[in-house]
Amino acid sequence: MSQLVVQYSFDEDGLLSRVTAANGGGENWEEEIIRDSEGLKIEKIFSGGIRMTRTYDAYGNVISQKSRSFRQDGYDRRYAWNASGRLQSVIDGITGGRTSYAYDAVGSLMSARYEDGTDDYRMPDATGNVFRSRDRRDREYGKGGRILRDRHYDFLYDVEGNLILKTPRRGLTQHPNHEVSEESGTHIVWQTGDYAYEWYGNGMLKEVRLPYGKTVRFEYDALGRRTAKLFNGHVFRYLWDGNVMVQEWQYEEKDRPQYSIDEFGRIRMQGEEPVENLVTWVYEEGSYVPVAKIQNGERYTIISDYMGRPVEAYNSYGNVVWQADYDVYGDLRNIKGIRDFIPFRQLGQYEDDETRLYYNRFRYYDPRIGNYISQDPIRLAGNNPTLYGYVEDCNKLFDLFGLDCKANKKQGTLAEDKIYNDLLHNSDVIVLGRQVYIKTPGIGRGRYSDVLIQSKKTGKIINVEIKSGGAVRSTSQIKKDILINSGGGVFGKNAPLDMNGKPLADMKTSNVTSSVRNVPLWEINM
């Protein structure tokens, strides 16, 4: 298998500044990241003369994003946000087309009016079930938010709540929640035009029989990461690094090695597994956002929107080879190029072209109905709208693992954990402490430093303030930071030693600067 070496470089504040991918043959792929004083990414410069720029409002929301190469202008959008931090409108800077969004009283996304004047509804009812019509009459739901019927299909489930049949045939069961089981004497077989779903005992999707009769099968490891997909005589294999897919390849199923179990119970592969059509995905360090696709010696740069969703891909010559927008369900629209050239959708989701389902680690999401096809494995702890529902607003929120809505986590703590762990692994700085108290005489009781670090190069101590999801410092915090930066702050008695072993307790902050790190929600790991 081809070895790709991905290297990450950081600035003196411990922030990612460069990504380099080298496979030993051909040119390297690179990304350079330029930030503003708050640590927000304002420009990215990629191999092939590709650039992406962003501007932000005072709350950290992206208000414009543009990409271009030496050959052509690319993605150009202007964003407007309402007082609640919800996306209000998007204007295409090239065509002038405008998309506007509407929300209900609790902030759930209800609809979009696209640039061509068409309306797309995602109308939630009081329990969180969503409908594609304004009057909410196009669907019928059962317990827990399972969809029973829409304008095209009936949906049938097993006793565990997993979807087992999506069929255009009507009235196949009289069960109030469309449950079908052998025990109850109701077993319905697949017919042409149906989608049939089979499940493993642990709740993972095993296979899907498509309307024309072919079957897609899936395999997983013990962590729920999909390792293989089998379809139409081909094996599609996946390799993971933690929670992100880093490589995939395919070959003919007839060439797949057999497995055996030795006398110690170990699984052995008989022969070498073929590796053909290898694709390598490159991510920014610590995130789920893909930034490059490496295939057959070609290097493709991936541009993502303010949420981290892919919206554009360039080849190494600076030509746009893929581009897309998203609808209110997270499905693609305005597609240019081959749909599955970039298979990533909402963060944590990978689209299967055969089924049009999004693999979302522990569940599969159907963007055509806006629901998962099985119940949340952690049930009510997931805090999603229903047991089958996706997030309330896919313009802002996401569900990385098909378990829970990211915004329902303690964002500040998660952001601090991310930056703290990043800094621990940064060889250019020493982490002195976390939640270190600094007194600010004359301005309140002082403040805590989220993370206190010291640069190995300059010896300067940096008070790192961490914000998540566009949060900003209060006026009081800014005043205290100004005092700290001017040397007027005093380290409290719980202060650590500096990297030379000198106690900082009761010392003035004469060698300290304050720095804000704003972590977008999509860069926060679970």
Spell out what each predicted region is:
Residues 1-8, 12, 18-25, 31, ...:
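Beta-turn initiation residues at beta-strand->coil junctions
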Residues 70-72, 76, 169-194, 254-273:
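Intrinsically disordered, low-complexity Ser/Thr- and acidic-rich flexible linkers and loops
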Residues 404-526:
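Catalytic toxin/effector domains delivered as secreted proteins or via bacterial secretion systems
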Residues 8, 33, 54, 79, ...:
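A residue-level detector for well-ordered beta-strand positions
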Residues 77, 125-126, 136-143, 292, ...:
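A motif-centric feature for acidic-aromatic and gly/ser/thr-rich catalytic loops and repeats
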Residues 15, 40, 61, 86, ...:
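Generic structural signal for coil-to-beta-strand starts
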Residues 76-83, 87, 93, 98, ...:
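Surface-exposed extracellular loop regions of Gram-negative outer-membrane beta-barrel proteins
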Residues 312-313, 331-333, 363-373, 377-378, ...:
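Short, low-complexity export/processing leader segments characterized by acidic and small residues
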